[in-house]
């Protein structure tokens, strides 16, 4: 009787125990990551050939305490290695774990290798060769605290490597995990199965192998036991011959049929090739199709199971498309697959909620480092594909009301960029902005007291509802998360797409970028201020400080300004400003662009201007600025410098976004200036709920100064 250990992915131990017991294993004991069991030689080989769930089958050789590297060396050398494999065989050591003395797994593996080689040298005056690739013998050592376990890895390569999958698409499932997903799905051999996002076909192939009684190890070309001195070749040949007979008979007898599709034709060709190598190609029909074209391949029955591992995405920008995909998929399941079962495996339970289906069973498992969930659903017939109540219904109703009002208003105003929703409801803390045919959803970062998973679920509900209310394709929605920007973060790129969209604002054309930066290049709340500047600037010399992408300069130029001077510290934004000026025909020496620290430039210029627009940051500590700037603390210093540049009948428009900003009117008067607040005049209909989004002032020389 052999004492053996079968390892597996965390979360699959109970399934593996049941599988081993069905094969005839005794005394099965679950530990984290595997199952200890007993069995004779026949059972040992059967577990290697037939286990669909095990990652490896190990034969323990020794267990001992390790308090030093010498203890490790002596414990390994105590094993009679020449009785296990011949000196003419190659070997490799896989070492995992550390303790206070063995702090590096590579060092531990080196000590084990030395002990094995020295064991041969002492007894035979010869040494075996170490081979990193496909060794004849693989020694597994696991160190936990002060206990080391040494085992012979009978598998060689991991058992998930069945031998049929030479090529895969992106993010493939390991075969043993795929087998577990199928077993947990409720699918029964003899019934049909569909995978509409099948990738390289692993789920379908594993299920077809189960249905046709094909041993998962039948196609492997390399094992870890064939160079073992105790290898029973006759018994192994008997078992593999029996497995081949069963596979041929099973292929003829099974009534199961399998259907797979994927949008990627190249991946579908991989899936077909994998199925041929696995010997189950005749059971599986593969098609290259977009999931939106999915139909039930057996509309007249019998009913079966839809099993899939849909994409979950790691980048924020991909989430709107994935949310739309899951929402559409849920509707299709109800429309075309009534009476079937559905089982989905995903790293994102939030995306699964977008199906708008109620799961009747749920399992957890690891897919490599990812925590994943598998949810099973019983699909009820619904030929219209209608779901339940729209998710985030309060939000959807408010957005629908706002859209009806604001779309009409925007058309009358001659603008195509405006805010549709601005955290109107406390539970849905987002801003929704329309930019022509596209929509940007900005999530305000939730407080740390809010459960991150709950916040993420609520955001997904918002996106789902936004797509539905606006009847918007998912590729027209851009998702961003807005949080307090510190230092240079406000200038750093979020993406590298470089996609610009030309939009209209009154008589101006402006370039926006919805993906690459936190802001889009157009501050919507300053729209009326820009319009006012255009009217104020006819025949005037116009200065735009902290100019960002120069949109105010565009309006001034279109309003007939004699000259525009646009100053900003960022080369990126100045190049953007130049694009904005050029697309409006504002070229020539009278339209200057200056890259400089605005505060330093102010201190060093003596130029005169009729209209000055300044919209400084609330606070700045950029490395390229010599000092910090605080708009509340420093606005008088700023006004003193601006006064020098302002012609006697000129006007400064001063705006900032600091909530609770207090203009020092006495200090302004002491400078010989007058300030008049015009905030209410610069606030538009789409920002009616947020009266504190900015404050705005007109500053002129006092009557005495004039």
Curated annotation (Swiss-Prot):
Alphabetical list of InterPro entries matching this protein: 23SrRNA_methyltr_KL (IPR017244), DNA_methylase_N6_adenine_CS (IPR002052), RlmKL-like_Mtase (IPR000241), RlmKL-like_Mtase_CS (IPR053943), RlmL_1st (IPR054170), SAM-dep_methyl-trfase (IPR019614), SAM-dependent_MTases_sf (IPR029063), THUMP_dom (IPR004114)
UniProt xrefs under CDD domains: AdoMet_MTases, THUMP_AdoMetMT
PROSITE patterns assigned to the protein according to its UniProt record, in alphabetical order: THUMP (PS51165), UPF0020 (PS01261)
GO molecular function: 23S rRNA (guanine(2445)-N(2))-methyltransferase activity; RNA binding; rRNA (guanine-N2-)-methyltransferase activity; rRNA (guanine-N7-)-methyltransferase activity
Location(s), subcellular: Cytoplasm
One CC-aspect GO term: cytoplasm
Function: Specifically methylates the guanine in position 2445 (m2G2445) and the guanine in position 2069 (m7G2069) of 23S rRNA.
Protein name per the record: Ribosomal RNA large subunit methyltransferase K/L
Gene this protein is translated from: rlmL
